[in-house]
Structures are given as structure tokens and as C-alpha cells.
Amino acid sequence: MTDTHSIAQPFEAEVSPANNRQLTVSYASRYPDYSRIPAITLKGQWLEAAGFATGTAIDVKVMEGCIVLTAQPPAAEESELMQSLRQVCKLSARKQRQVQEFIGVIAGKQKVA
């Protein structure tokens, strides 16, 4: 039961009839037996307008009679320093020590011999 002072606020639905798309489940051939498996293809400029630009990671939730696609937010850009540290991790132990010594000299913690 509603309160006597409550007023229903009209709202506009996020999904309007203009945003609806009609698709048909097609099929794709599966190698090596070439059996037909269900396939859904989505393409069009409307995908980018909806937040699904090329390269966007997508979370897929599957329920009976319903598939929900959600665009994942882009990962934060890694700083140039962190990218450099990742490169240093790939170096030999000797070169890693040299980088550590260089950082110590730059930071003023060590004296140059």
C-alpha cells in the first residue's frame, strides 16, 4: 500500500522502441564434423553508440531465454613508470641491480664511487 503523500514520478525508459533490434539466431559450422551450432551476430554503428566500441571487453550473462551483454569499463592506463618497471622485471638479475643502484643514486641515498 502506498503512502498518501507519495506521488509516482514519471520516468523515461532507457530502452525505447527506437532502440529495439530484431535478430534471428543463425548457425555456424563447427570443425571437424561441420555440425551446425547456434550463432548470433551483432554488428552496426549502433553498437558503438551504445558503448560497445571495437576492442571493448564484454561481460555475458546467460539465463533461460535471456542474454545480457554489459560493456566492461576500460582499464585505467598504466603510468609510464609502471610500464618501465615491468620492462625491468624482464631483465637479468645483474641489470636489475644496476637499475636499483641508479635509482638509489637519483634518489640521493647512495654516493657515486
Curated annotation (Swiss-Prot):
Example of a GO cellular component annotation carried by this entry: cytoplasm
Domain SpoVT-AbrB: 29-74
Main localization (coarse): cytoplasm
Protein function: Involved in the degradation and recycling of damaged RNA. It is itself a target for degradation by the ATP-dependent protease Lon.
GO terms assigned for molecular function: DNA binding; RNA binding; RNA endonuclease activity
Xref: Pfam families: SymE_toxin
InterPro entries according to UniProt: SpoVT-AbrB_dom, Toxin_SymE-like, TypeI_TA_SymE
Domain of life: Bacteria
Protein name: Endoribonuclease SymE
PROSITE patterns referenced in this protein's UniProt entry, alphabetically: SPOVT_ABRB
Localization terms from the record: Cytoplasm
Any GO BP annotation: RNA metabolic process
Record's keyword terms, sorted: Cytoplasm, DNA-binding, Endonuclease, Hydrolase, Nuclease, RNA-binding
Top enzyme category: hydrolase
